[in-house]
Amino acid sequence: MRVVILGSGVVGVTSAWYLSQAGHDVTVIDRESGPAQETSAANAGQISPGYAAPWAAPGVPLKAIKWMFQRHAPLAVRLDGTPFQLKWMWQMLRNCDTRHYMENKGRMVRLAEYSRDCLKTLRAATGIEYEGRQGGTLQLFRTAQQYENATRDIAVLEDAGVPYQLLESSRLAEVEPALAEVAHKLTGGLRLPNDETGDCQLFTQRLARMAEQAGVTFRFNTPVEKLLYENDQIYGVKCADEIIKADAYVMAFGSYSTAMLKGIVDIPVYPLKGYSLTIPIVEPDGAPVSTILDETYKIAITRFDKRIRVGGMAEIVGFNTDLLQPRRETLEMVVRDLFPRGGHIEQATFWTGLRPMTPDGTPVVGRTRYKNLWLNTGHGTLGWTMACGSGQLLSDILSGRTPAIPYDDLSVARYRSDFTPTPPQRLHSAHN
């Protein structure tokens, strides 16, 4: 089957890889000059299934009001009055109760755990290298309340069979030695030993080369104007004076998916702006061993080979990509506070990107009412964590194979009022 994939970020490229491996003739189209040039370029580097959780959580509405008056707030909102922004925010607020939070986190962890299995299988099969580490993730708590609240997430982890360690502050240095100097500022941490890290852009670029060698065609510097449709199917992709045709089409345009699908499929994917710093390491023993998640500021600090990646924050500001100095100051403040000897902060590279976020936090993966249009978008801050699983899942569904995990509550159909999901089962291993 001829398949066109729109988008060459980590989700688009993994989709191309798995579809090609399933025997399809795949073409990837992107406006950029190469893969992973936008949202996948400089994310936090975490592959953290256990921390997969929606931003829509109990208490967030009240916290958002408090954050409006804080200098280093993890979330910022600038209302633009557009119906899309207001509707998306209202949908997000409706998911900020315990029932929705547990439901959304459960399916996010399910897909994320499966995705890590798929990544391990892919890594073993291809030998791909991307400065990856398998050292686990450590979520740091600065207050007693945060430490106590961890029990809510632990319940989801136990239900999904995810190993964890709840550590008091005196034990944090056992897994991250550099924290010994600052442990007095912390109340404890939640460690997930099976989590991983890696450079998402490096992975995507190298997998794209492997996919190209396997027969995938990449059409870079090719802006897409619109999808052409008639009745119940797509019949082409209009790119300037050219119409590119295929048997099936996969939307993986991230934050730009919603506009491209206007009038075809209504999906609530909104750009959630985030920032990162990439810092050269100066003292290896003063840098993190793996990856840290600061619960207070919602900022991740990740170790690559010779660099530290500091990423986080969320701004609901539309498609604005300005680099704001106060956000840089927040990232610098957190990394100086936790790893003061780690890196040359004054030499850091400052970056921003737009994460494609749904109001319930769960990506949109699967079929649509158009028989040859498929979606793989809306992964929010977890595109790197969920990419391989989403790509394998999409390939299985499109190819008529039975996926290894339940998936109907990942489709766009879940936004229908009459949708009733199949009860999820325990996680299965990835395909051999």
Swiss-Prot record:
This protein's pathway: Amino-acid degradation; D-alanine degradation; NH(3) and pyruvate from D-alanine: step 1/1
Catalytic activity: a D-alpha-amino acid + A + H2O = a 2-oxocarboxylate + AH2 + NH4(+)
GO biological process, one term: D-alanine catabolic process
One GO MF term: D-amino-acid dehydrogenase activity
InterPro entries given in the database record: DadA, FAD-dep_OxRdtase, FAD/NAD-bd_sf
Main location: membrane
Keywords of this entry: Cell inner membrane, Cell membrane, FAD, Flavoprotein, Membrane, Oxidoreductase
Role according to the record: Oxidative deamination of D-amino acids.
Protein name, entry field: D-amino acid dehydrogenase
Superkingdom: Bacteria
The protein's Enzyme Commission number: 1.4.99.-
